[in-house]
Amino acid sequence: NDEFDQYLKRFNYTFKNENKETAGYAILKNKKIILAMDIGPSPIGPQSNDYQSGALSFEIISSGKKLISNSGYFSNKQNKLNKLSKSTALQSTLVIEDYSSCSFKKLKSLGYLVDQGLKIMNKNIVFEDNYWKISASHDGYLKKFGSIHNREIEFYPEQTKFIGTDKIVRKNKDKNVKFDIRFHLDPDSKVMKTQDN
C-alpha cells in the first residue's frame, strides 16, 4: 500500500534480495556478466496466456550484449507463431522427444493457456565473488516420459568460465529417449571453436 511505501522511504529502509530470485527467475550479476535462469513453476489459468515453456532455460549477457538467449515471444495470438514461440524448442534448455515441457490448450478469447504445467524442485542458488551456481529440476516430462530434468550452471568470474550440466533422471531406464539441448545465440554474437572444443 502507498502509505507503507512512504513510511519505508521516509525512514530510509532498503531491502536487499538475498536469495537472488525474482518472479521465478534467478538473476546473478556483476559489472560485466548477467546470468538469468527460469526456475519458476509454470503459471496456471489466464496468467499463463503469455507463458513460454522454458523451464530451466537461461540467458547470458556480457557487457550489455546477449550471448545466449531465448528466441523471444510472438504476442499476436491470432498468428501461428504465437503457439510456436511458447514451445520449449525455442528456449535455451533441454527438450525430450521434441515435446514441450508444458502442454497448451487454445481458448478463443485468451489464446493458448497452459493445460498441463510443471513444478520446480531442488532449487539452489549460490552467489559469491568467485563462484556462482544456479541449479534446479522440473517434472514437465515426468508424466509422458517418466523423466525429471536437472540443470546446473556454474560460473567462475575470475576465469570468465561457464560450466553447465544437464541430467535426465528416468524411472524406466530400459527405454531410451531422444533429447536435444539447445542454446540460442544472439544473431550478433560471434562464436569460434577452440582447440579443446
Describe the role of every protein-language-model region:
Residues N1-S69:
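Carbohydrate-active enzyme catalytic cores, enriched for enzymes
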Residues Y73-N197:
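CBM-like, beta-strand-rich accessory domains located in the C-terminal region of large
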